Amino acid sequence: MEAYDICKFWKLDMLEEFSQIVLKGKKKIILDIPSPSQQNKSDIVSLCPADSPETCNSSIPDWLVKVMRKENGYDPKLIIKRRVLCTTDLRKNQGCLSMHLSKLEKSDFLTEDETRFLDEDFLKAKRDGLKVFLVDPESDKHVVYLKKWNGNTVWKYVLSHGWNNVIDKKIFKVNDVIEIWSFRDGSGKLCFALSSPTRCGRSSSGHSS
């Protein structure tokens, strides 16, 4: 009888120890579930391409993160950090926004196929351009055409056709300063995004959520 009691108490001790192990395991599982704020940070990191850590190290503005989430976007690249808009940029008879190759912060935003297309398109008498999307500071998306151009021995990319729709919104004024970014939407399509303009050291409102 005494041996039986000892065995019974030993089994109870083992059962209690096992229960503690299970309880600790459950607590660990609960602690390992990321909070909403942690999930948001994770989402932001996932916007950066694994093969371009330098992009992740640079500061991705909040407005661009919102735009990219809306488009399931990824691979953000700062194309031009400080683009001062001039009179010709806002003239509808010009109908394009230019980006001088010498002013580009990043020149690897095009795929090999896109680069080849633009090079071949440049040789045509009438250039078709590469169909891309442009997101303005009010988060409206426009269809525009990216072309390669050589004017006065200066190589540049231009966003044409749909640019006049942006002009019509009267978001920009002469001497406004903007940033130009690129990214890929969920289908891999090339997109450009424009920051809200800065005027006299102040940023105008834009990029609604």
Curated annotation (Swiss-Prot):
Keywords: DNA-binding, Nucleus, Transcription, Transcription regulation. SUPFAM superfamilies: DNA-binding pseudobarrel domain. The keyword DNA-binding applies. Residues 101-198 bind DNA. PROSITE patterns: B3. Its main location: nucleus. The keyword Cell membrane does not apply. One of its GO terms (molecular function) is DNA binding. GO terms for cellular component: nucleus. It is found in: Nucleus. PANTHER family: B3 DOMAIN PLANT PROTEIN-RELATED, DOMAIN PROTEIN, PUTATIVE (DUF313)-RELATED. This is B3 domain-containing protein At2g31420.
